[in-house]
Swiss-Prot record:
GO terms for molecular function: phosphorelay sensor kinase activity; protein histidine kinase activity. Residues 171-212, 313-341, 432-505 form the PAS domain. It catalyses: ATP + protein L-histidine = ADP + protein N-phospho-L-histidine. The modification 4-aspartylphosphate is found at D876. The chain crosses the membrane at residues 111-131, 139-159. Its EC number is 2.7.13.3. This is Sensor kinase CckA. The lineage of its organism: Bacteria, Pseudomonadati, Pseudomonadota, Alphaproteobacteria, Hyphomicrobiales. It comes from Brucella abortus (strain 2308). PANTHER family: SENSOR HISTIDINE KINASE, TWO-COMPONENT SENSOR PPRA. InterPro entries: CheY-like_superfamily, HATPase_C_sf, His_kinase_dom, HisK_dim/P_dom, HisK_dim/P_sf, PAS, PAS-like_dom_sf, PAS_4. Residues 825-941 form the Response regulatory domain. It holds the Pfam family HisKA. Disruption phenotype: This gene cannot be deleted or disrupted in the absence of a complementary copy expressed in trans, indicating this gene is essential in B.abortus.
């Protein structure tokens, strides 16, 4: 066991006249345990070969302080010299010690008092003997009574320990011995500044030779400017009842160079207040002065050695840094700082992180190094660092990782070598090694080499990055089988592909799989056989490359979903067009029948039932067209705040009394351009959908707000461009939508409601309207907490025009003239016979002269036969041989002012793009009624060009 050196300082003080009894030793002793073999200062204090000493609390008023210095294999020379100087190395058995120069006067002891009492009693007895005749027997009885009382009191005091003789003196001697033999100077003064105690050490320090030369410490240091402030602070601390210490440096020491030396001496001065008792009428002040010059010199030597060690480490020919578990660099030597271009004057611990200096996927290599709890681990890593100027530096890490016993990571220490440096003979080889390592660890794909049994031999940084949750560096070092990073369901396919690589096949199909434990991450493996003709890589049987295809899979799923929605939309649009033709014929025929039947007619209800169901079917077709984005929109500038305010009453009636409707209007909303009626339909559909999700009641919140482009970019919604938007949200507190259902909610005819309670077209129509408007719709939902639909409408930024003034709600239609009759000549072009027949009868019933054609070619022939005597043409859009837009272009060549109306089940903009921008025409969407047809024709004829 090597010796350990410690310094123990005990400041002992006591008030004058205090007594140390066995009771005090038993109940208030402070035990100080010292290693007599190791503690030289303890020997200097007179504590020799004692495992334990007990000092009474009343006698020792200061503290026991242990200061540990550096562990040494042998005691220092200074310590041995000081030990010899004190002269206490040999064991002492007597109680001799230097007497103090100033000692408080002691009052008479108990024995002395008893002796005086005894003498007085003997004198009284002698006087009685001489004058017994005169005094009589009464005096003798009184004297005997007094003596008996004194005897009883003595016996009682001795039995109870109240009267003690030698024991009190022994304890006083022990305390005095401890104080007087202290190597530190000790002086105690009363409230008037008079010294009541001073030991020989204090006299030597101050140069006093007798009691008259002893001065209080504040007077000794009064002429020392360097110490006056320290004495002032100590005095104030004592006045406040506190203990304090200061260290001062005095030229020549306290004795002012009495020994002929003016060398500076360091002192540690301690002060504390003591209870003075009634005799001193106030507290005493105990001062202790210790010469710590050797200690300060040792500290200076230690500091110089530390500075030299830091200087050696800073300018070593290798870089060095240390990082905490969070990856923040807490130390960086000058060599590495110079390599990286880091200004050490600006560097502070934690101001740099490993991510700031490690390039590419190098962090994956560093993070993969882990140690077992309570151990450390060393590893070698080749990677690139990033200089301040952006250039890379090829280095080799000798990396040490420590882990605490509880498993918490500790501070890392790393030596960094520049791989580009070396002798001339190894430059080419070193350069090739650097280039390969840089390529290997910087490759964007994971690379691993395996042996013939599928065990992993080596991996690059990207491999550890991708598969960090499956394998770590320890597993790679143990040569774990590569199949462990493949999901169990795909391992058979993976092993077959790996066997093909072992067999030397050149073309092997890649293997797609997911990470074990995280099936949301997709991985694709590529196998390549190893042909090693030179025998340099005899162990390697195949090289496996892997890329993460999670984003690719997500894009593929999005594309498939988009194509599916587009295909469904095209199908829905085609079906809707055909249905519109059928419904148009039914509705117009119903109107013709109703004109010939009164309400009292028995068949009138049946005809009305036919028309009502036809209109209901027409509503479903409109929803299909909305989803397929083929309905006609009339966009206008809208202020959503006003639109929702006008809708509030309607929405409140729709959601019912059990559901609270809350509308949160955003401030200063930007204008948007949308079809007012269609937007109202969107709001109604979403509110009704939210209502149905809360059968037991809840809350629906409609919210609007502006989102700048910068905030929109942070949302990470799929396909949402970075732009300014006005967001319309519909939030409910309903049951929520499961994830598997959430992907299908916008598909037409998809519904989770019971049969007869929903068509499955509500959200499909919302989706189509928003897409056709140029906006985006997303749904966030959590089962059991509710659903939020978010609609992003692009901000309208353009100069305001008179006809684009924001509107709050749908303007009331101006009442049209009830007279729908006319005498104009109409050319009706329609390939559907039923629709054409109904249109002809409807217009003829209003007084029009109608000519009919089944195609565009036939219409041109009729126009030629009539010599152009046609006032208006009503034409379908999609027809065989020649469609409606082509017919319009041909007619305008010879009849530029002819009026033209298109009728179609598709949206107006679906065919308007095929016409000149200045083309003028009317539009009537299918299905339409007899009245709607007559009204449109009448308005077009009366319209002034």
């Amino acid at each position: 066991m090597r010796p350990k050196w410690c310094k123990t300082t005990v400041l002992a003080s006591f008030p004058r006249g205090s007594a140390c009894t066995a009771r005090q030793l038993k109940h208030s002793a402070n035990r100080i345990y010292l290693d007599a073999r190791a503690s030289v200062p303890a020997r200097r204090a007179g504590i020799l070969n004692e495992d334990r000493i007990e000092l009474p609390d009343d006698a020792i008023g200061a503290s026991a302080e242990r200061r540990s210095t550096r562990d040494l294999r042998k005691p220092s020379r200074a310590g041995i010299q000081h030990e010899r100087a004190v002269g206490l190395m040999s064991r002492q058995t007597d109680n001799t010690y230097p007497k103090p120069l100033v000692m408080p006067k002691r009052g008479p002891s108990a024995a002395l008092r008893l002796l005086i009492v005894g003498i007085l009693l003997m004198g009284a007895a002698f006087i009685y003997f001489l004058f017994r005749d005169q005094l009589g027997d009464g005096f003798a009885l009184v004297l005997m009574g007094v003596l008996s009382m004194v005897g009883v009191f003595y016996l009682f005091g001795a039995a109870t320990g109240l009267i003690q003789f030698s024991q009190r003196s022994d304890h006083q001697d022990l305390a005095h011995s401890f104080m007087d033999t202290q190597p530190e100077g000790t002086v105690i003064s009363d409230p008037r500044g008079q010294i009541v105690y001073a030991n020989q050490a204090y006299a030597r320090m101050t140069g006093a030779t007798d009691a008259d030369g002893i001065r209080p410490l504040d007077q000794v240091l009064a002429s020392e400017p360097a110490a006056s402030d320290a004495i002032y602070r100590l005095t104030n601390a004592v006045r406040d009842g506190l203990s304090a210490q200061e260290e001062v440096r005095i030229s020549g020491g306290l004795s002012r160079g009495a020994n002929g030396s003016l060398a500076p001496v360091w002192y540690r001065i301690k002060a504390r207040a003591l209870e003075g008792g009634a005799e001193f009428k106030g507290p005493l002040v105990a001062w202790q002065v210790a010469d710590i010059s050797e200690e300060r010199a040792e500290q200076e030597r230690f500091f110089q050695e530390l500075q030299e060690a830091i200087n050696h480490l800073d300018h070593a020919p290798a870089g060095f840094f240390s990082a905490n578990p969070a990856g923040r660099i807490i130390y960086l030597n000058a060599t590495l700082a110079e390599w990286l271009g880091v200004d050490l004057t600006q560097f502070t611990p934690g101001s740099l992180t490993l991510n700031d200096i490690v390039a590419g996927s190098g962090m994956a290599l560093i993070k993969a190094v882990k140690a077992e709890p309570g151990t450390s681990r060393n590893t070698v890593i080749d990677l690139d660092l990033i200089k301040r100027n952006g250039q890379s530096l090829a280095v080799r890490f000798y990396h040490r990782v420590q882990t605490a016993r509880d498993g918490m990571p500790g501070t890392t220490r790393t030596i960094v070598l520049d791989r580009a440096e070396g002798d001339d003979s190894s430059v080419a080889q070193r350069s090739a090694e650097v280039r390969f390592t840089r390529f290997f660890n910087s490759a964007p794909m994971a690379i691993a080499a395996v042996d013939a049994e599928g065990h992993t031999l080596r991996t690059n940084a990207r491999f550890l990055d991708i598969f960090s949750g499956v394998v770590d560096r320890d597993a790679i070092d143990r040569r774990v089988k590569l199949e462990n990073v493949v999901h169990e369901r795909d391992r058979e396919t993976f092993n077959k592909a790996l066997a093909a690589a072992f067999a030397g096949q050149a073309s092997i199909s890649p293997v797609d799989t997911v990470l074990p434990g995280n099936e949301e991450r997709h991985i694709r493996f590529y196998m390549s056989p190893v042909t090693d003709l030179g025998g340099e890589a005899a162990e390697e049987a195949a090289v496996i490359s892997a890329v993460e295809t999670t984003e690719q899979k997500a894009l593929e799923n999005q594309m498939a979903q988009s194509q599916k929605m587009q295909a469904v939309g095209q199908l829905a649009g085609g079906i809707a067009h055909d249905f519109n033709n059928v419904l148009t014929a039914i509705i117009m025929s119903s109107d013709l029948l109703l004109t010939n039947h009164r309400a009292s007619d028995p068949s009138f209800p049946d005809i009305m039932n036919i028309k009502q169901n036809a209109n209901r079917a027409a509503s479903l077709v409109r929803q299909l067209l909305a989803f397929s984005r083929r309905q006609t929109l009339r966009p206008e500038v809208l202020d959503l705040t006003d639109v929702l305010a006008d809708l509030r009453m309607l929405l409140a009636r729709l959601v019912g009394k059990d559901i609270e409707l809350k509308i949160d209007h955003g401030r200063d909303l930007w204008p948007v351009k949308a079809d007012l009626g269609q937007f109202e339909q969107v709001a109604v559909n979403l509110a009704v959908n939210a209502r149905d999700a809360m059968p037991e009641g809840g809350q629906i919140t409609l919210r609007t707000r502006n989102i700048p482009a910068a905030d929109a970019a942070k949302l990470h919604y799929r396909d949402l461009p970075e732009a300014d938007y006005v967001v319309f949200e519909v939030e409910d507190t309903g049951t929520g939508i499961p994830a598997d259902v959430l992907e299908k909610i916008f598909e037409p005819f998809f519904t989770t409601k019971e049969v007869g309670k929903g068509t499955g077209l509500g959200l499909s129509m919302v989706y189509g309207i928003i897409k056709q408007t140029g906006g985006f719709i997303y749904c966030d939902s959590e089962v059991g907490k509710g659903t939020t639909f978010k609609i992003f409408l692009p901000r309208l930024i353009e100069e305001k025009r008179a006809d684009d003034a924001p509107v709050a709600a749908k303007e009331k239609k101006v009442e049209k003239a009830t007279d729908l009759s006319g005498s104009a000549t109409v050319l009706l072009v329609e390939d559907e016979d039923a629709v054409r027949m109904g249109g002809v009868r409807a217009l003829q019933s209003r007084g029009y002269t109608v000519h009919e054609a089944a195609s565009g070619v036939e219409a041109l022939e009729i126009m030629e036969e009539l010599g152009g005597e046609v006032d208006i043409v009503v034409s379908d859009v999609v027809m065989p041989e020649m469609d409606g837009p082509t017919l319009l272009r041909e007619l305008r060549k010879t009849h530029p002012d002819i009026k033209f109306i298109f009728v179609s089940g598709y949206a107006e903009d679906a065919f308007a793009r095929n016409l000149p921008a200045d083309a003028k025409f009317g539009f009537l969407p299918k299905p339409f009624s007899l009245k709607q047809l007559a009204t449109t024709v009448k308005e077009m004829l009366e319209k002034q060009d």
